[in-house]
A protein has these predicted regions:
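Small-residue-rich alpha-helical segments with characteristic i,i+4
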Residues: 164-188
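Transmembrane helix-bundle signature of multi-pass membrane transporters/permeases
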Residues: 17, 48-56, 180-191, 255
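Structured core of small recognition/catalytic domains
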Residues: 180-184, 190-193, 198-204, 213-215
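Alpha-helical transmembrane segments and their lipid-water interface positions
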Residues: 28, 55-66, 92, 190-198
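Juxtamembrane transmembrane-helix boundary motif
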Residues: 1-21, 32-44, 63-155, 170-171, ...
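Transmembrane helix boundary and interhelical junction motifs in multipass membrane proteins
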Residues: 23-32, 155-167
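Generic alpha-helical scaffold signal
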Residues: 25, 29, 54-57, 73, ...
Length: 269
C-alpha cells in the first residue's frame, strides 16, 4: 500500500465522519466507488464487506457524541429495526455470489440516483413539527424498510444509512432530529450483527502486507476509522449550524455525483 493510497483512505475517513454526523449515512456511498477505484483487484463482495465494516467504525464514533447530547429514541424501535437490517444484510451478501458484478454495481447506481431525486424532493417539504407515539404499524413498517435496505446494503456495500435515513424519515414516529441517531444505531448494531458472514467465508483474494479475515480487510478499516476522529468534533458543530434544506440539497448532490461517477467508472472507462 503506497503513500497515495493511504492519503486517499485518510481523506475518506475524514469525509465519511462528516457524512455520518450530518446526513445520518455512514460513508458507504463514498467508500464503495473509492475502493473500486483504488483497489481494482478486490472482488465486489470484498468491497461491500470492507465498506460496511468501515461504516460501523465511523457510526460508532458519532454515536458517542449523540449519546452525550441525550437525544431520546425508542429502544424497541432501535432493536427491531437493527434486527431487520441484520437479516437483510446477510441475505444481500449471500445473494451477491449468484449475481454478475455489473448487476450489483447497477443496483448501487440506481439506488444512488433514486435517493438523490427523493432527497431533492424532500428538501422542498417543511420540517416535521410533531411526531406520534411509536405504534405497532411503525415497528412493522420500519422493520420491512430496514430489511429491504439491509439487503441492498449487503449486496452493494452502501452501508445502510443512506437507504435507512430517507426511509425512516417517512415514519410519523420519527422526528428529523432523530434520523441520524437511528441510522447510526442501526449501522452499528446491524453492522456488527452482520459481520459473522463476512468473517467466516473464505475470500479468493488476499491483499499482501495487510491484516485480513475472510472478506474484511482490517488494515484499510483501521486507517479510515482512525482518520475519522480528526473531523468528529467539527462534524457535530456543523450539524447544529446547517438547516434542513441545505442538508437535504447537499446530500442530494453528493448522491447524484457518486451515482454518475460510479457509472462512468464501471461502464464507460
Amino acid at each position: 500500500m503506497d503513500i497515495y493510497t493511504i492519503a486517499v483512505l485518510i481523506f475518506c475517513g475524514m469525509f465519511s465522519n462528516v457524512m455520518s454526523a450530518i446526513f445520518g449515512i455512514g460513508g458507504g456511498v463514498l467508500m464503495v466507488p473509492i475502493l473500486m477505484t483504488v483497489f481494482t483487484d478486490f472482488p465486489i463482495q470484498m468491497v461491500a464487506a470492507t465498506s460496511l465494516s468501515i461504516v460501523i467504525g465511523t457510526a460508532l464514533i458519532n454515536l458517542a457524541y449523540f449519546i452525550r447530547q441525550k437525544i431520546k429514541v425508542s429502544l424497541l424501535s432501535t432493536l427491531l429495526w437493527s434486527l431487520g437490517m441484520i437479516v437483510g444484510v446477510q441475505l444481500g451478501f449471500y445473494a451477491s455470489f449468484y449475481m454478475h458484478e455489473n448487476i450489483i454495481v447497477g443496483v448501487f447506481v440506481a439506488t444512488m440516483l433514486i435517493l438523490s431525486v427523493k432527497t431533492f424532493i424532500a428538501s422542498k417539504k417543511p420540517a416535521k413539527e410533531s411526531i406520534s407515539a411509536v405504534g405497532v404499524r411503525d415497528l412493522t413498517v420500519g422493520s420491512l424498510f430496514t430489511t429491504g435496505g439491509g439487503f441492498i446494503a449487503g449486496l452493494t456495500g452502501i452501508g445502510g444509512g443512506s437507504i435507512m435515513a430517507p426511509l425512516i424519515k417517512q415514519l410519523p414516529c420519527v422526528h428529523p432530529s432523530q434520523v441520524a441517531i437511528y441510522s447510526n444505531y442501526m449501522m452499528v448494531l446491524g453492522g456488527i450483527g452482520s459481520m459473522y458472514g463476512y468473517l467466516i467465508k473464505e475470500c479468493p483474494y488476499t491483499m499482501v502486507n495487510t491484516y485480513q479475515i475472510g472478506y474484511i480487510n482490517f488494515t484499510i478499516i483501521g486507517i479510515v476509522v482512525l482518520s475519522s476522529f480528526v473531523t468528529s468534533f467539527f462534524s457535530m458543530k456543523l450539524r447544529k449550524i446547517l438547516s434542513k434544506r441545505v442538508t437535504d440539497l447537499a446530500l442530494g448532490f453528493i448522491l447524484l455525483f457518486i451515482g454518475i461517477y460510479t457509472t462512468v467508472l464501471k461502464f464507460v472507462l
